[in-house]
A protein has these predicted regions:
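ATP-binding N-terminal substructure of ATP-dependent carboxylate-amine bond-forming enzymes
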Residues: 1-86, 108
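Hydrophobic alpha-helical membrane-insertion segments
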Residues: 23, 61, 135, 166-167
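Active-site nucleotide/adenylate-binding loops and adjacent lid/helix of ATP-dependent enzymes
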Residues: 80-166
Length: 167
């Protein structure tokens, strides 16, 4: 709406044919945000590309950058945002305060760490990819909780009691 007031032409790609933005933009394209070809075809017609959600095909954004398109945030930044392990490592490398964490490739590796008393309950489990707004995040209080987790790469953080989360 604000872009319209400033005479800025907007295009939107969305997988939902009934997307709320459909009636607010100048050009609406129905497309898959994870499909390389959909994103490159869409982005090649734009001057500047930005996105509302982090779950988008990074390789397509790299291709668009290579074609000289302005992409914000940059694909390099998005790659870090999409992976909790890379994100936490970035925080540590840049002296940004964050909860202590460990990375595990599998549930087997996690259980081995618990069995060797290298990890104490409770802790916070986070899948490294495709988690957001509480999805892919669980407080783990016991080994029986671990058995219910999906077997995919993960980080576990020390449990830190808090009053409010800001994001």
């Amino acid at each position: 709406v604000e872009c319209n007031k400033m005479n800025i032409h907007t295009s939107v790609i969305d997988p939902n044919k009934d997307s709320p933005c459909k009636n607010q933009c100048d050009n609406f394209v129905l497309g898959d945000l994870n499909n390389f070809d959909d994103i490159v075809k869409f982005g090649s017609k734009c001057d500047i590309i930005t996105f509302e959600i982090e779950h988008i095909n990074i390789d397509a954004l790299v291709e668009l950058e290579n074609l000289g398109k302005e992409v914000y945030p940059k694909s390099k930044t998005l790659r870090i945002i999409q992976d909790k392990n890379l994100q936490k490592t970035f925080f540590i490398d840049n002296n940004i305060p964050t909860a202590p964490f460990k990375y595990f490739e599998s549930i087997k590796d996690l259980l081995t760490s618990i069995d060797r008393d290298k990890l104490k309950f409770p802790f916070v489990w986070k899948q490294t990819k495709f988690g957001y707004d509480g999805f892919g995040v669980k407080v783990i209080n016991s080994a029986s909780d671990v058995e219910k987790l999906p077997d995919k790469p993960m980080i576990v953080e020390d449990y830190i009691p808090f009053e409010k989360e800001l994001s």
